[in-house]
Swiss-Prot record:
Disease tied to this protein: Myopathy due to myoadenylate deaminase deficiency: A metabolic disorder resulting in exercise-related myopathy. It is characterized by exercise-induced muscle aches, cramps, and early fatigue.
Binding site for Zn(2+): 303, 305, 572, 649
Gene behind the chain: AMPD1
InterPro entries in the record: A/AMP_deam_AS, AMPD, Metal_Hydrolase
NCBIfam families, per the entry: AMP_deaminase
Chain positions recorded as substrate binding sites: 305, 374-379, 575, 650-653
A GO biological process held by the record: IMP biosynthetic process
Phosphothreonine carried by residues: 81
Protein name: AMP deaminase 1
Cross-referenced Pfam families: AMP_deaminase
Modified positions (Phosphotyrosine) in chain numbering: 216
Assigned keywords, A-Z: Disease variant, Hydrolase, Metal-binding, Nucleotide metabolism, Phosphoprotein, Zinc
Length: 747
């Protein structure tokens, strides 16, 4: 039996909890834009007034306590120095390995040089009472269990180390289970056609039906009439809402905020001491590592949009080149007539020869700060939507030929650079069901394949725009247009071979739009079902995210059953808006892009650290839109040990050079004074985060890259010092073990 289980009645969140969660949501949404900017404190705990109030509160609890001798003994035991155990190598699949007392001895690794460790003695739970510490540990434990559950159901990633600790807390044996891992398409072999269709699986003829926003799979028509779907893991909305309300309450609890804030401050300070003591030893490791430096270790642009994957000079050069070659070619169609390229520019009253990067006006500047609407206008070269349709769209008069050529040129630059990869996003809007067919036809017909690129699908959250123009009757139709064609291609791949081949190259789904737009709607059991959402108002971020996740979960189970590649859910999150966005992502997203607002919530930031959720940060993009570069939390997150990578977002708007990813690294290195080891660690994180295949990750990171800590690092390929990897792993285990120690005291 597990050592610690929540009682059955606690699992069902009562009305009081739900009401509390609604109050928390309301307080997060109210004055969202201004409150945090006006406050001089990143988190409330830094405020000296609240600090003194907390100390007085703790003293009051201590003086009023009339506990028995047993309680005083338990309190004393909780306040003495605790020697924490850290799992090292896996000596057994059923038991966590331990070391001698943490303070008197240090862990040793065969491949890690000796280095100086930071040792903390004294009260590990200082600042909170023992009772509060137990409450905190219970809450963090359950939060990690919630994430683990949603990741495993959808074949997304959850690290081994916290999973081991969770099983240890439960009193259960941890067993490695690779069946929960995502499946990516292997790399194309030399001489193999990446668009071959002769190896597609056979059609199954299953029936599909969307019910309450989720696609259900039925073996035959009779099963549809009886409502007996195939036994796939379908989502449970009530359970999701209960879990969401629990997390809403958790991130608002005072003791949890105090404890997590103190732990994060400790992590930051500990890293700075580690750097001061071991920076030269890390550098010595890297200097002794032959044929590997920052330039030739693999790095992936984990967040980039295909429509802006080129820099402004590249786009300008291509426009001029196309005019030289295709001036008399019919390239554009209006209601009146078809236009040649020459006639189109004449209609716009301009000549390509006269264009400059300034007149092209696609670069974000001071005018776009806090103005996402103006930023979207930058996608129109020279402010002309006709040029955007011609050069940056897949569905136009020339079938997206120019856009395909630009992407191929960007891919050729990546191949030439050799050690850089990218994950461009292509858009599916959900306006009509034939979008998938058109996009896959564009992809296959133009033979868009690059060994240094993997692809993702982004879904803009613009239902309100389509509904106001009467393109869609309800939100359920948008979900149907997004997911039904993918399910059909999974069940009957030979019916649409182009889409089936295209899906092999897709690794995940992204949810994109301006997060600072508030919907004011809290997702609850009272929310309309997707087919009932006929309002012109946009659903909330959580509403979008849940139904995307729910369909991806069912889709992944079906594709895994068929031996096909699966998809990850990797949304934009935390760039702006309410903290509920990040809370939702913690539950159901494999990884996120941006994550700036984590600095406003110590609880969520600490949970992201414990679960090692990857975050693709884009400081140059944020600098033009939401946050000045010097205030970016990138360095703070890196020091604390969050799993962050660098990405470009939109090179056309934010970068100047031919290698925008290197530009991103170079500026971060200069502004934040990053060491070579820091940059290589971020690069290694990007490869772990991305959707390239297992075979390629083995080649880029080493045979044991799935192992966590120094055992999974091959310095010959990653150029990350083993000292750094050992420090990260031991610090991570220390924090996880604190939770385990806190729960032991409840027995």
């Amino acid at each position: 039996m597990p050592l610690f289980k929540l009682p059955a009645e606690e699992k069902q969140i009562d009305d009081a909890m739900r009401n509390f969660a609604e109050k928390v949501f309301a307080s997060e949404v109210k004055d969202e834009g201004g409150r945090q900017e006006i406050s001089p404190f990143d988190v409330d705990e830094i405020c000296p007034i609240s600090h003194h109030e907390m100390q007085a509160h703790i003293f009051h609890l201590e003086t009023l306590s009339t506990s028995t001798e047993a309680r005083r003994k338990k309190r004393f035991q909780g306040r003495k120095t605790v020697n924490l155990s850290i799992p090292l190598s896996e000596t057994s699949s059923t038991k966590l390995s331990h070391i001698d007392e943490y303070i008197s001895s240090s862990p040793t690794y065969q491949t890690v040089p000796d280095f100086q460790r930071v040792q903390i003695t004294g009260d590990y739970a200082s600042g909170v009472t023992v009772e509060d510490f137990e409450i905190v540990c219970k809450g963090l434990y359950r939060a990690l269990c919630i994430r683990e559950k949603y990741m495993q159901k959808s074949f997304q990633r959850f690290p081994k180390t916290p999973s081991k600790y969770l099983r240890n807390i439960d009193g259960e044996a941890w067993v490695a289970n690779e069946s929960f891992y995502p499946v990516f398409t292997p790399p194309v072999k030399k001489g193999e056609d990446p668009f071959r269709t002769d190896n597609l699986p056979e059609n199954l003829g299953y029936h599909l039906k969307m019910k309450d926003g989720v696609v259900y799979v039925y073996p035959n028509e009779a099963a549809v009439s009886k409502d007996e779907p195939k036994p796939l893991p379908y989502p449970n909305l009530d359970t999701f809402l209960d879990d969401m309300n629990f997390l809403l309450a958790l991130i608002a609890q005072g003791p949890v905020k105090t404890y997590t804030h103190r732990r994060l401050k400790f992590l930051s300070s500990k890293f700075q001491v580690h750097q001061m003591l071991n920076e030269m030893d890390e550098l010595k490791e890297l200097k002794n590592n032959p044929h590997r430096d920052f330039y030739n270790c693999r790095k992936v642009d984990t967040h980039i949009h295909a429509a802006a994957c080129m820099n402004q000079k590249h786009l300008l050069r291509f426009i001029k080149k196309s005019y030289q070659i295709d001036a008399d070619r019919v390239v554009y169609s209006t209601k009146e007539k078809n236009l040649t390229l020459k006639e189109l520019f004449a209609k716009l009253k301009m000549h390509p020869y006269d264009l400059t990067v300034d007149s092209l006006d696609v670069h974000a500047g001071r005018q776009t700060f806090q103005r996402f609407d103006k930023f979207n206008d930058k996608y129109n070269p020279v402010g002309a939507s006709e040029l955007r349709d011609l050069y940056l769209k897949t569905d136009n008069y020339i079938n997206g030929e120019y856009f395909a050529t630009i992407i191929k040129e960007v891919g050729a630059d990546l191949v030439e650079a050799k050690y850089q990869h990218a994950e461009p996003r292509l858009s599916i809007y959900g306006r009509s069901p034939d979008e998938w067919s058109k996009l896959s036809s564009w992809f296959v017909c133009n033979r868009i394949h690059c060994p240094n690129m993997t692809w993702m699908i982004q879904v803009p959250r613009i239902y309100d725009v389509f509904r106001s123009k009467n393109f869609l009757p309800h939100f359920g139709k948008m979900l149907e247009n997004i997911f039904m064609p993918v399910f059909e291609a999974t069940i009957n791949p030979q019916a649409d071979p182009e889409l089936s081949v295209f899906l092999k190259h897709i690794t995940g789904f992204d949810s994109v739009d301006d997060e600072s737009k508030h919907s004011g709607h809290m997702f609850s059991s009272k929310s309309p079902k997707p087919q009932e959402w006929t309002l012109e108002k946009n659903p909330s971020y959580t509403y979008y995210a849940y139904y995307m996740y729910a369909n991806i979960m069912v889709l992944n189970s079906l594709r895994k059953e068929r031996g096909m590649n699966t998809f990850l859910f990797r949304p934009h999150c935390g760039e702006a808006g309410a903290l509920t966005h990040l809370m939702t992502a913690f539950m159901i997203a494999d990884d996120i892009s941006h994550g700036l607002n984590l600095k406003k919530s110590p609880v969520l930031q600490y949970l992201f650290f414990l679960a090692q959720i990857p975050i693709a940060m884009s400081p140059l993009s944020n600098n033009s839109l939401f946050l000045e570069y010097a205030k970016n939390p990138f360095l703070d997150f890196l020091q604390k040990g969050l799993m962050i990578s660098l990405s470009t977002d939109d090179p056309m708007q934010f970068h100047f050079t031919k290698e925008p990813l290197m530009e991103e690294y170079a500026i971060a290195a200069q502004v934040f004074k990053l060491s070579t080891c820091d940059m290589c660690e971020v690069a290694r994180n990007s490869v772990l985060q991305c959707g390239i295949s297992h075979e390629e990750k083995v080649k880029f990171l080493g045979d044991n890259y799935l192992e966590e800590g120094p055992a999974g690092n091959d310095i010959r390929r990653t150029n990350v010092a083993q000292i750094r990897m050992a420090y990260r792993y031991e610090t991570w285990c220390y924090e996880l073990n604190l939770i385990a120690e806190g729960l032991k005291s409840t027995e």
